[in-house]
Structures are given as structure tokens and as C-alpha cells.
Amino acid sequence: MLSSRLGLFNMFRLLAAILVFTGLASAVNADLLQTGGSRWVVLASTRDLDNAIGIANLYQHRFDDVRVAEASNGWLAVIAGPVSIARGAKAAREELWSAGGFPPDLFLSNGQSLRRTVWEPPKGRPIPTWSYKGGQPLVFSAGGLEIEVSHLAEGNTRYPSITLRRAGRLLIKEVLKGSESFGDNMNAEVRLVWLDRAVAEPQIIFSSHWNGAHCCTVSKILTKVGNGWTSIEGATLDGGGYRLQDIDGDGSVELLSVDNSFLYTFAPYVFSSAPLVISKLDGDRLIDMRWNSAFRRYYRRELFGWEYRAKLEPEIWRKNGFLSAWLALKSVLGESDQAWTVVLENYDRSSEWPLTVCDAPLKEGVCPEEATREVSFPEALRDHLARNGYLGPQVAKIEETSKPTEQPSPADSTSTPAAPEKGAASSAGTGFFISKQGHLVTNHHVIKGCSAIEVRRPGQLRLPANIVAVDPTNDLALLRVESDTGAYASVRVETRLGESVAVFGYPLSHVLASGGNFTLGNVTALAGLGNDTRFIQISAPVQPGNSGGPLIDSYGNVIGVVTSKLDALAALAVTGDIPQNVNFALRGASLYAFLLSYGISPVAGSNTQKLDAPELAERASSFSVAVTCE
């Protein structure tokens, strides 16, 4: 009897536990359940929260509710809506697809498989806002201030104006001269917001829209500094002006916008894209927060959103307007080298949009006509990034005596540099000229730790070379000699599997011919060890001393920089076999990006005339040098 009672008691405990658990589960996802005629739109799933948020941000303007929810399988779902299924789920999906911009694999959910919401767009406090449409002055009180919004008339032109007073005493009066109107209709706005909590009073954003095609909103920020008030010019922005959000959670709202300098620069407006800009008020200055680590995650989410959009529209990877702004975002995140490779392999070479650079200082924001020069897209993009601060602190030029931290590639455990060799010099390798100003390229490991570097063309005297820059991650070094006017290489960024290639260099110069060594082969793989896409695999024989030398195509263009050969003994230990002619070169696209980042625009390679082997050897010899260092 006692055993039966205990069994019955345990059964009731189990039932109670199940009921409690069910109740808790319902409580957890009650706000996610959709009953009746509504469903969530499931847009994407990922394990990365920042990726999910980046995707969700793309759809905020299209739905009342967008959020990231944890699904029962542990993945993160990007959901939006809810949408009506009154005409059926199929009709609801087709309506979304017909609107455009939605993934083909979206589906509708009643939320039962969703556990909890893990992210929603920050709500923020309501921002007091007043609008002025022209006519009679708008007068109101806010933040202890008496505010009057009106206009200043100059002939038939009218400009929005704002006046601040306290207890009848004038504090400041400002006019938006960049936003003129030719009638009584205006579109001015006043927002009262805390942009700088270090100031005792909130700030005022005074803005006005031009009502012109594609453009523009001009703004002034009024803030108290010391005992008085001052105004700060905001950027002239496409569309509706600054968006406001407290990103870093310090109680001060940041100003979000886009970099209008990218609009019309690389493509017509409709095909232009512009990267995110985050600004923060500090006293009487607007501070660019691109390089502030507190905002790195926000930029990462922005990038995820861009790349998700490109996943839905793969053709935009061929649009120069998109590529330029995407590269700017990648540069902010310190990933410009990898991004340049993508840009150089995909940009639209047939675009007829005029691209120029200015070879002189701007005069009132305009380039003197005589200093304007037409250039290729890569050169125009590099110049634009430099002028607008996107090369940033990740670009670090060094002096010859500097010793940067080595960052080995994934291939290091089983690949061996094709240099250095032992001999009279402490190391030796190959390099090649890349500009008529005497710039040349070699591997970083060839010149690492050198106190003196010399280069020599065949049959000529040695010339001293100085280090301009190094990239240890990609094993590149940029050198320069002062008195060289010889041939220099052209660079091609595309690489095709199986294409014929040649290697020129000065391997084993203490044993082999000192006049250079030329070998032929093919591109055998479009990635290095560990699928490292910075590199390509080649069958052309490589020996110690070839490091830093050119990999050339059938037309005499450089398509890579020889870096290493597979360590045969290490490979034997791993595979039980000795590989033959497994060698590696850094892609031409990575070389091109490295040079652009230091202001050098290589001559673009051509494929107009194929060269036979002797002509290729002569061409390679003309711009290649032996590199020695002590």
C-alpha cells in the first residue's frame, strides 16, 4: 500500500513539473506566439548575433516589428512582421517577394519554435521635435529656453532662422544659408536632444531640407559652451539628415549619417552607395568615431547588412558604386587588404562614368582644372579613400630600422620561404620594379632585420635601397632606390586555374648562374595551404632565393609574388609522400591592394600580345633585381 501511494505521489510530482515547465515555456515566448490570421516572416537564420542584427537593421523601415529570436535549435532567427495570412500563407509570401528585397527561402511562422527575443531595435526616449513650414514665426518654450523659428528674407530668397532667448535675453541667432526657399513653403525642423552630457543643457539640432532632387538636408547644432552659446555646422546630407541613437550607452546621443562624398563619385546617383558615418559632439566639435573601438561592433553589424544585401543581389558585386562604399566600411574595420582583392577582381571595367583625381590642393573645395587627371577606378578609389580619411590608423609606414610584429599565415607550418640562402650576405632574394620612381617589391622575410639592403639589375652595379613599407601578414615589402630609370612591371589582378605562368629570380646565386633563372609552369590551384585565398599554387620550380620574385603570365604581366615552396620533409611526415613542384605565390590582387594603400598605382596589365618563352624571360629580367641584405 505504501509503495502504491509513493508511486502515485511521484506521478503527481511529474505531472506538476510538466505543467510548470509548460507554463514557463509559454511565458518565455508568449510575445512571440502568433495566433489567428497573423504570422512572423522568418528572413534569415545564423549563429552570429551581430550578423543577425545587421540583417534585421535592413528591414526596420519595412515592418512595424523586427527582432532577433532564439529558435528551439539554438540558432538565431531574424523575424519581422507580423503579416496577415487572411488570403493564405502562399499569397502572403508571394506579396512579399513581389515587393522585392526579400530572400527566396523566407517562410512564415506562428512562433511556436521560437524560445525568446534576444534583440530588438533600441527604442530610446522620444525626442521633442517641432516643424516649421514657413509663414508666421513659430514660437515655443523648451529646455528652459524661448525658441523662435522664422526666416530671413533676401529679395525673393528666404532662409530658415532660429533665435534662442532666456528671460528675454538674446542667447544666439542662426540662419541656415545652405537651405534657401523662393516662397513661403519651408521644411525646417528643431530637435531638442542630449548630444553631450558633459554640458549642463541639452543641444538643439536645427535643420532644413532643400526639397531638391536627391538632396539635401543642412543642419546646425546649437550648444552651450562656457557661459555662452555657439553653433556647429553639420554635414550637408542626402535625404532627411541625421539619425539619432545612443550607440555606446553613455546617455549622449550619436549622430548617424552617410558619407555623401561617395554619391555621384563612382557611379550615377541611382547606383551609388555611401558608407555609415558616426559622429559625436564633444564641446564645440563634432568628432568622427570611425576609429573608436566603442563603435566597432556597430560598424561590423552595418557591414553584415551590406553583405546580406549583396547575397540577395549578387550583381551588385560588379557595381563600382557599391564596391567603393563597401571597401570603405571594410577599411574602417581594418580589413582593406582582403577587400581590395575582391574589388580588383570584380569592378566594372566597362563603366563609362568619368573618374578623376586632383594633383594639386583643392581651392574652395574645387580642383583646379589644370590639375585634374583621368584615372582608372582603382586609382580613383584609393585617392578618394585617402582624401576622406578611410586609410586611417591601420596604414602604418615604417622606417628602415623598425621591426614589425610577425603575423604568420596559415601555411607556415608546412611551407618554407624560398629564401633566404646562405652566402656572403645574411639573406638574399629577388625583387621587381613597380614604378618609374624607383619603387620595387620583394618579400618581407627577405629584408626582415636587415641593416643594409642592396639591389642589382643584371650587369649593373648594386644600388642601396630603403624600406618604404612592409606588410608582414602578406609577406610583402616595398623598397625604393634613388637613381633607377629602367623598366618596371605591369600588374594583372585576375588569375585563372591552369593558365601558363613563369617565375624569374636569382635562386642559389652562389651556386647557379648570377644572371637570373627562368622556369615555366601552371597555376595548379587558386588557393594556398588551408584554402588561403590570398595565395595561388604553382608548378613552376622555385628555389631558395626566388622569394619576392615576379610570377608572370603569358603576356609578361606580374600576376603574383613568389613566396614559398611546400616543405617536402614536413609533407612527407604528414602524408607519407614527397610532393613535387608545389609552390606558392601571393595573388596579384593582394599586391595591387598593398601598393594602392601606399599611394602607388601600378600600371594595369594588358593581354594584347602573347610572348614566347625567350621573350618572357627577357621581359622579366628587365624589371627584376637580385636583393641582398646585411
Swiss-Prot record:
List cellular component terms (GO): plasma membrane
Keyword Transmembrane helix on entry: yes
Q: Which keywords does this Swiss-Prot/TrEMBL entry list? A: Cell membrane, Membrane, Plasmid, Transmembrane, Transmembrane helix
Q: Name one GO molecular function term.
A: serine-type endopeptidase activity
Pfam families hit by this protein: Trypsin_2 (PF13365)
Q: Where are the transmembrane segments?
A: 8-28, 258-278
The UniProt annotation puts the region (Disordered) at: 399-426
Could you tell me the superkingdom of the organism this chain comes from?
A: Bacteria
**Main subcellular localisation:** membrane
The biological process GO terms on file are: proteolysis
- SUPFAM superfamilies reported for this sequence: Trypsin-like serine proteases
Q: Where in the cell is it found?
A: Cell membrane
Give the compositionally biased regions (Polar residues). Answer: 404-417
Q: What kind of membrane protein is this, topologically?
A: Multi-pass membrane protein
Asked whether the UniProt record includes Transmembrane among its keywords, one would answer yes
The similarity comment for this entry is: Belongs to the peptidase S1C family.
- What this protein is called in its record is Uncharacterized protein y4bJ
